[in-house]
């Protein structure tokens, strides 16, 4: 079962905009019994590898969070949301999955709109492995929908935007996360 933890990233030490504050407030409203964890430069080692170091030094915080979200959910389990994701209901029904992901369109899965997993989940590990060519910091950055979807395709995902169940988790159509 996925633990009742919500992870999010906020790197750069800047003040959160109104939208982020509103979205985080919605998590607290609909998930009062969840632990909410902000990952930032104080509790995540920016020097984990050359990729994380490069992203941070070049203020590519969105790309940094694409990678960090996978590591923290893999290590700790829980749900991840970008700070522009507003909840309109409690997500407890998703916790029974080993992992859950959502399509953003018929071809791509997007972990930023929300995903969750038990710690050490196979699919999340596969997503982390997709970053291996980038960890030296010499190959630039790439958006997470492409990398994350490629990882799930290797595990049997069909790119058609449909509801799909696997031994490692469930992928939901975009309607669940829009």
What annotation goes with each model-predicted range?
Residues 1-65, 81-178:
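Glycosyltransferase-associated regions of secretory-pathway enzymes
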Residues 67-78:
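Small-residue hinge/turn detector
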């Amino acid at each position: 079962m996925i633990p009742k933890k919500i992870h999010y990233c906020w790197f750069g030490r800047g003040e959160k905009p109104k939208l982020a504050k509103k979205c985080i407030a919605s998590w607290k409203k609909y998930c009062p019994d969840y632990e909410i964890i902000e990952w930032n430069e104080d509790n995540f080692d920016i020097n984990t590898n050359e990729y994380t170091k490069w992203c941070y030094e070049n203020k590519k915080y969105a790309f940094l969070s694409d990678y960090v979200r996978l590591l923290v959910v893999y290590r700790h389990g829980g749900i991840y949301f970008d700070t522009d994701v507003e909840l309109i209901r409690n997500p407890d029904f998703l916790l029974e999955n080993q992992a859950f992901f959502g399509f953003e369109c018929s071809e791509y899965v997007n972990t930023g709109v929300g995903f969750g997993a038990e710690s050490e989940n196979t699919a999340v590990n596969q997503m982390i492995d997709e970053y291996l060519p980038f960890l030296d910091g010499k190959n630039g950055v790439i958006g997470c929908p492409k990398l994350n979807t490629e990882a799930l395709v290797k595990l049997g995902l069909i790119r058609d935007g449909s509801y799909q169940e696997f031994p490692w988790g469930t992928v939901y159509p975009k309607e669940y996360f829009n």
